[in-house]
């Protein structure tokens, strides 16, 4: 909503203690007694009621007082709304947070965010303290961002809870089967690159973000939907567009007063588009699923072993059967696409831009890839052994994470931090990611160094922390703790396979006049969508494992 009350929608300084307890003070004396029936109450009962009320009031007023935290970006004295500061937050959130820690070093403070309102920003050192706190809810925060109870928003609800079928499939099938999906990813990369990057051996230019989005959509869909659907143009269009459309729809609905959202969304073009895309997704996926179910039923009736597919369609079927539950296939598949495709393609774009600006590292990467894959190709340990490539990914994510804050949560109960700060129930909070650019933590933190984490591995005890998929308060690219990105292991494999093919098969450089300028939108941090590159197919002989 446009109007913003720093004390929150439940706050009203004129309310009395009796009103807070649900008793209006507009009735007094005998009139109040008559209305409530107290005139007929035995004196002892009346005294007990009064005593109970007094005890309740004393308990409420003597409870722990919330810490009054400073607001780094408050409205001006004569501003009636927070519209101006919200607009500033949308374009300059990183600088607002930086200003907060300059004014209040090492201390929590509040900021007004355009997406969820008043938010407590915690220093990075609090990441380990709160990472697994059961009183802090990621689900409640997501409920503030999206409106998953509304038609068309269902994929944003999937994955909120630990026992959701989407999260369970990621943990129990996708991550466990990483070694089995490497070759399918490689085969699809071969086909997709011919279509998207082309086999043109002459220099030609392309929009980097666009070609990477198309590539990652193909690779992800190969694992999520299998060979039959991963090249389906209708599905690829839906899976790329839905994420953008649902975010636009949610942003529009946040401007609408809460009670009206259930009505307004029916007429909102962005929400209508989301509903349409969910329906279209079902029309693409359900016929394939029904075909598989019929095939399995036939084979089982004939006493034959049912066909097993190595994709998420199969995994969802197995998980639903084991849980004895039902699910919407289009919803869970759009959930996977929403959390995977745009974030992965964004990082691939950032990495390729970093490599183009640091071309001296490309040959060492090619040498590592050739060395690792020379003996046996895509083995189980192949991607793990590419330590320089792993370092490059982690370094690019360090300098340009997907957001400038991480671990966004809502306190479901009162919370007392180790420094004594008391945060009341309902507090929305986030941990600043600025330690990733802290000169006290990293040497030359603003400079991209692809060897940074390779070198860190040589420090005793640091090998684990140097891995791309590891999380800590020093590197919050994937979050930290219980709700750290569960799909980061798949993203790592997908990115490494894609980059192996790109680096070995293509030369690329920034197009003339291109200046890389990644974009902020509130706390989000996006790869520059305007980057153009020159690329060409390399005329080199490659081992057969690059064609399979």
Swiss-Prot record:
Q: Sorted alphabetically, which SUPFAM superfamilies does this protein's record hold? A: Cytochrome P450 (SSF48264)
Cofactor(s) listed in the protein's UniProt record: heme
Which positions does UniProt annotate for heme binding? Answer: 485
Catalytic activity, EC: 1.-.-.-
State one Pfam family annotation: p450
Q: What happens when the gene is disrupted?
A: Abolishes the production of heptelidic acid.
Q: In which pathway does it act?
A: Secondary metabolite biosynthesis
Q: Which GO terms describe its molecular function?
A: heme binding; iron ion binding; monooxygenase activity; oxidoreductase activity, acting on paired donors, with incorporation or reduction of molecular oxygen
Q: Does the keyword Oxidoreductase apply?
A: yes
One GO biological process term is:
secondary metabolic process
Q: Which InterPro entries match?
A: Cyt_P450, Cyt_P450_CS, Cyt_P450_E_grp-IV, Cyt_P450_sf
Which keywords, in A-to-Z order, does the entry hold?
Answer: Heme, Iron, Metal-binding, Monooxygenase, Oxidoreductase
Claim: Cytoplasm is one of the keywords in the record: no
Q: Which family does it belong to?
A: Belongs to the cytochrome P450 family.
**Name of the protein:** Cytochrome P450 monooxygenase hepE
The gene from which this protein is expressed is hepE
């Amino acid at each position: 909503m446009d109007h913003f009350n720093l004390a929150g929608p439940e706050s009203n300084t004129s309310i009395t203690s009796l009103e807070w307890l649900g008793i209006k003070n507009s009735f007094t004396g005998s009139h109040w007694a008559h209305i409530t029936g107290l005139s007929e109450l035995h004196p002892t009962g009346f005294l007990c009621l009064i005593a109970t009320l007094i005890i309740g009031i004393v308990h409420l007023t003597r409870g722990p007082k919330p810490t009054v935290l400073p607001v780094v970006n408050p409205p001006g004295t004569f501003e009636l709304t927070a519209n101006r500061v919200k607009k500033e937050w949308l374009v300059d959130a990183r600088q607002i947070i930086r200003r907060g820690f300059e004014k209040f070093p090492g201390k929590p403070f509040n900021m007004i965010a355009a997406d969820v309102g008043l938010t407590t920003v915690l220093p990075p050192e609090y990441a380990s303290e709160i990472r697994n706190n059961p009183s802090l809810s990621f689900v409640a925060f997501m409920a503030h961002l999206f409106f998953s109870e509304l038609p068309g928003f269902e994929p944003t609800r999937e994955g909120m809870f630990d026992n959701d079928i989407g999260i369970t499939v990621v943990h129990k099938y996708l991550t466990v089967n990483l070694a089995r999906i490497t070759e399918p990813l490689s085969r699809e990369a071969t086909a997709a690159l011919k279509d998207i990057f082309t086999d043109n051996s002459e220099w030609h230019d392309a929009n980097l973000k666009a070609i990477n989005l198309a590539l990652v959509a193909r690779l992800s869909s190969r694992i999520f939907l299998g060979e039959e659907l991963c090249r389906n143009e209708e599905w690829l269009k839906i899976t790329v567009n839905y994420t953008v459309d649902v975010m636009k729809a949610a942003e529009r609905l946040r401007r609408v007063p809460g009670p009206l959202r259930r009505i307004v969304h029916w007429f909102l073009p962005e929400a209508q588009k989301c509903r349409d895309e969910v329906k279209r997704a079902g029309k693409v996926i359900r016929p394939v699923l029904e075909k598989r179910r019929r095939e399995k039923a036939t084979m089982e009736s004939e006493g034959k072993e049912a066909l097993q597919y190595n994709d998420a369609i199969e995994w969802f079927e197995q998980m639903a059967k084991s849980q004895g539950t039902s699910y919407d296939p289009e919803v869970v598949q759009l959930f996977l696409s929403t959390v995977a495709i745009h974030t992965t393609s964004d990082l691939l774009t950032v990495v390729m831009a970093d490599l183009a600006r640091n071309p001296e590292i490309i040959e060492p990467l090619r040498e590592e890839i050739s060395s690792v894959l020379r003996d046996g190709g895509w083995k189980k340990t192949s991607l793990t052994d590419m330590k320089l490539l792993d370092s490059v990914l982690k370094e690019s994510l360090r300098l340009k994470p997907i957001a400038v804050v991480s671990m966004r949560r809502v306190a479901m109960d009162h919370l007392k931090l180790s420094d004594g700060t008391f945060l009341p129930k309902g507090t929305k909070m986030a941990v600043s990611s600025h330690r990733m650019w802290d000169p006290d933590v990293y040497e030359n933190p603003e400079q991209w160094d692809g060897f940074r984490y390779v070198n860190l591995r040589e420090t005793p005890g640091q090998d684990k922390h140097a891995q791309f998929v590891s999380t800590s308060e020093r590197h919050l690219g994937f979050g930290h703790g219980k709700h750290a990105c569960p799909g980061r292991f798949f993203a790592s494999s997908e990115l490494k396979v894609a980059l192996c093919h790109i680096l070995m098969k293509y030369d690329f450089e920034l197009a003339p006049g291109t200046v890389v300028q990644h974009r902020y939108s509130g706390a989000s941090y996006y790869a520059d969508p305007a980057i153009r590159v020159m690329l060409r197919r390399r005329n080199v002989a490659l081992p057969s494992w690059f064609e399979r």
